[in-house]
A protein has these predicted regions:
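Non-heme di-metal
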Residues: 1-205
Length: 205
């Protein structure tokens, strides 16, 4: 928790978001059906957690391979968070975002404390869940005839995000090289369960 507080303070000190950037995000917010807003609320919460997973990793790990991996993927997850946030009203976002930040930080920091392979096992578990999560939403949108331009734009965002998450999963699997042992498998099962619970909560709160 102390690492989390220090990292949070550093991020606040270095924040450089501009008013122009914020105006662009507001300009892109569109009117969407309630069910799609619910899906996007879970996506926004999930991408928030993903950003903080990498912050958690970077706050602990000194392994150069892990740090390069985390820094590169953090940039991608920040872009995902912005893109999804650009089509979801602030008032429709999960009210539990502080919880998702802390949960994400812990999910990244714990495996980084144990070892580099655990980081990659964790990312594989997270991205496997996210791949399936996005796929369901994309299929639902694909099933709608005469999709309006706003919803088509959302589908394009989800497809791009999903492609990135699949690439993250495959890269983590490749770098890990060895199959996880029993304890690592139990940890990954816990991460997957936590992801399912988070989606259910974010959809409602």
């Amino acid at each position: 928790m102390e690492n989390y507080r220090k990292y949070l303070g550093k991020l606040h000190a270095n924040r450089t978001e501009t008013s122009e950037h914020q105006s662009l995000a507001r300009a892109r917010i569109v009117i969407l059906p309630a069910w799609l807003e619910g899906d996007l609320r879970t996506d926004h919460a999930g991408e928030t957690g993903a950003v903080w997973i990498y912050h958690g990793i970077l706050s602990v790990s000194r392994n150069p391979i892990v740090r390069e991996f985390a820094q590169r993927h953090l940039k991608t997850e920040k872009r995902h968070l912005y893109e999804i946030g650009s089509v979801l009203k602030r008032t429709r976002r999960s009210r539990l975002l502080p919880v998702w930040r802390i949960a994400g930080f812990i999910t990244g920091a714990v495996p980084a404390l144990i070892g580099s392979r655990w980081v990659f096992y964790t990312i594989e578990a997270v991205e496997t869940f996210v791949d399936a999560h996005y796929e369901l939403q994309i299929r639902r949108l694909e099933a709608i005839r005469n999709l309006d331009p706003d919803m088509a734009a959302v589908r394009t965002i989800l497809e791009a995000c999903r492609a990135d998450e699949i690439a993250h999963r495959d890269e983590a699997l490749q770098i890990a090289t060895k199959r996880p042992g029993l304890l690592a498998r139990l940890w990954c099962a816990l991460v997957s369960l936590g992801s399912r619970i988070a989606v259910a909560c974010a959809r409602r709160i």
